[in-house]
Amino acid sequence: MTTFYLSLIISLFFLIITLKVFFNTSRKFKNLPPGPQCLPIIGNLHQLKQPLHHTFHTLSQKYGQIFSLWFGSRLVVVVSSLTIAQECFTKNDIVLANRPHFLTGKYIGYNNTTVAQSPYGDHWRNLRRILSIEILSSHRLNSFLEIRRDEIMRLIQKLAQKSYNGFTEVELRPMFSEMTFNTIMRMVSGKRYYGNDCDVSDVEEARLFRGIIKEVVSLGGANNVGDFLGFLRWFDFDGLEKRLKKISKRTDAFLQGLIDEHRFGKRNSNTMIDHLLTQQQSQPEYYTDQIIKGLMVVMLLAGTDTSSVTIEWAMSNLLNHPEIMKKAKNELDTHIGHDRQVDEHDISKLPYLQSIVYETLRLHAAAPLLVPHLSSEDFSLGGYNIPQNTILMVNAWVIHRDPNLWSDPTCFKPERFEKEGEVNKLLSFGLGRRACPGENLSQRTEGLTLGLLIQCFEWKRIGEEKIDMVEAKGITAGKKTSLNAMCKVRHPLKINDVF
Ligand code: HEM
């Protein structure tokens, strides 16, 4: 009899717990944004075709400007409206200031402790402060100006040598990647890693490093199914975790080597490592080697590809629209003339050139879904309930093509930015406290590179055919095919440095 009552009490206890969980859960998931039917266990993962922002665009046409998906057991909400995106990063900015954790963050991002992956809180705030003051402040960016100028001039010289005797076909992508990569690498460590004229004494070291970065970029992204289906991780069926473990060891050893070189060898130069090692001397408990390596990784991964793909898209659009290229050239000829090269401080006086950069960022945002955010508590958005631990993605690609916001939204028309306030509708660098801290640096690099490319050369397409504008599948939305074009040095331009 006692056993009977005991079993009854235990059963009732479990029934109450189950009902409580059920009611809490269903209340929690009541009034969610609409979304497609999902399958047991995998949710909507089977529907996620690359590029993801295109799939989300199709889904938003059916389910609206805010919809829900299930990535395995994780709820994902996708926003495709500027007003709702602004609601995310004003009223709900703190609730959405966390990041979801992915396998790449665990292995490459020092267990999600870097500034790009770290949860919102004191640690993240400190890292943002270090990044803003020690590396990306206007003062520091000015002190790194010579590096940027030198790398861009190397690119200009290379093109000038190739095309001095007339129109010559050039492949631009590797040159843009070399330039942005060397710029960031020199800011970080003082070393040039790319190109025939790289100054790394150990060529093997340069080769190894290029391999590391290529692999890290290919493993990044928020669409590894193993991130959402925990049980797949136990089997590591695609070997992703094993590859990430291996690559993280190589990356760490490489970055540690760079720090040690500065610690035990050449100090007192203007590099990020040296500035951080100086801070380490006074505050060793905070400025650990791991913090420094995390900042190096973020600078290299967030700051290189993003800028080079933007420059490649801008040039592709200019080649498809010679009248825009001509207008930009006239602006440069009028304001700068033929006797000197355009410089970074001129860019603010060249509104049309700036508008070309904005228009490129509108149509070809390098991070079309920004970077995923995570809600730290339940909140409401666009009239729906969003539970804690929801992954939020903003489809900037769609918002930048919204016909209610932009006239002829798919046309490349820099003139649209002549209207005051238009630039405030851009989401290319995100909004709110987790917005991109590298915006100023990237706009300086893009403005100067494009300015010099337009000022110093004549450009045309290889044939009649327009440049193919199809997007690749990688984490940064680059062009699928590498950009080749015909270029010729502009003879009226008497610039000794270039020739
Ligand atoms: C065209 C160039 C670039 C574009 C389009 C771009 C875009 C973005 C976007 C959309 C985000 C996420 C914002 C969000 O979470 O809502 C981001 C974050 C970030 N970007 Fe950039 N970025 C560019 C260049 C750079 C550069 C040059 C650097 C640094 C050298 C940089 C460093 C970062 C960092 C550290 C974060 C993470 C911020 C955080 O989580 O607190 N980015 N970027």
From Swiss-Prot:
Cofactor(s) it depends on: heme
Localisation: Membrane
Record's GO cellular component terms: membrane
UniProt GO molecular function: heme binding; iron ion binding; monooxygenase activity; oxidoreductase activity, acting on paired donors, with incorporation or reduction of molecular oxygen
Transmembrane segments: 3-23
SUPFAM superfamilies with a match to the protein in the record: Cytochrome P450
Keywords: Heme, Iron, Membrane, Metal-binding, Monooxygenase, NADP, Oxidoreductase, Transmembrane, Transmembrane helix
InterPro entries (UniProt xref): Cyt_P450, Cyt_P450_CS, Cyt_P450_E_grp-I, Cyt_P450_sf, Plant_Cytochrome_P450_Monoox
Membrane topology of this protein: Single-pass membrane protein
Residues the entry annotates as binding heme: C436
Main localization (coarse): membrane
Pfam families for this protein: p450
Intrachain S-S bonds: none
Assigned EC number: 1.14.13.-
Domain of life according to the entry: Eukaryota
Family in the record: Belongs to the cytochrome P450 family.
Function, as annotated: Probable monooxygenases exhibiting no activity with isoflavones such as formononetin, biochanin A, pseudobaptigenin, daidzein, genistein, isoformononetin and prunetin, or with flavonoids including naringenin, liquiritigenin, apigenin, luteolin, or kaempferol.
UniProt protein name: Cytochrome P450 81E8
Organism: Medicago truncatula (Barrel medic)
